[in-house]
């Protein structure tokens, strides 16, 4: 199944997963870019950077098999196999980035917006009763089942 065919299924968990991949890149870039502020914004940029690494392991299940991680971390990551749990963690990460506005308006708002959109896609998938479907391109079919 190609990416175009995956999008044609109209499964919101696929949309959420691909939005999550974009979140990885955006959170990583903005986390590094905002580390150079001389204010409390550094805390939020560090949290954005940490979020990018969490999202990598959430959205690309093959990495849990490849990278040496502790059993505690693996257990924590396996909690996010349903649409509702993924929506919850994305919304949690989005709220943290929205709170960065308290310190100063910065480019971290873009990360907050995209994380909120990803949470929305996963929440819609849950509300519509769509089961979580992992993208084949990201190792979702077959490989993901070996990990779980």
Curated annotation (Swiss-Prot):
Keywords: Glycoprotein, Golgi apparatus, Membrane, Transmembrane, Transmembrane helix. The keyword Transmembrane helix applies. It is a multi-pass membrane protein. Glycans are attached at residue 11. The keyword Transmembrane applies. InterPro entries: TVP18/Ca-channel_flower (IPR019365). It is found in: Golgi apparatus membrane. One of its GO terms (cellular component) is Golgi membrane. The chain crosses the membrane at residues 12-32, 38-58, 82-104, 108-127. Its main location: Golgi. GO terms for biological process: vesicle-mediated transport. Golgi membrane protein involved in vesicular trafficking. Belongs to the TVP18 family. This is Golgi apparatus membrane protein tvp18. The gene is tvp18.
């Amino acid at each position: 199944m190609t990416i175009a065919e995956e999008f044609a299924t109209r499964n919101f968990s696929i949309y959420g997963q691909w939005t999550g991949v974009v979140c990885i890149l955006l959170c990583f870039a903005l986390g590094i870019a905002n580390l150079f502020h001389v204010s409390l914004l550094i805390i939020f940029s560090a949290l954005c950077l940490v979020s990018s690494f969490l999202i990598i392991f959430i959205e690309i299940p093959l990495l849990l098999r490849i990278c040496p991680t502790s059993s505690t971390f693996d257990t924590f990551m396996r909690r996010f196999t349903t649409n509702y749990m993924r929506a919850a963690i994305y919304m949690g990460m989005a709220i943290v980035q929205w709170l960065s506005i308290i310190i100063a308006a910065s480019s971290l708002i873009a990360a907050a917006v995209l994380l909120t959109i990803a949470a929305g896609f996963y929440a819609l998938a849950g509300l519509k009763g769509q089961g979580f479907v992992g993208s084949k391109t990201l190792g979702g079919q077959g490989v993901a089942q070996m990990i779980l």
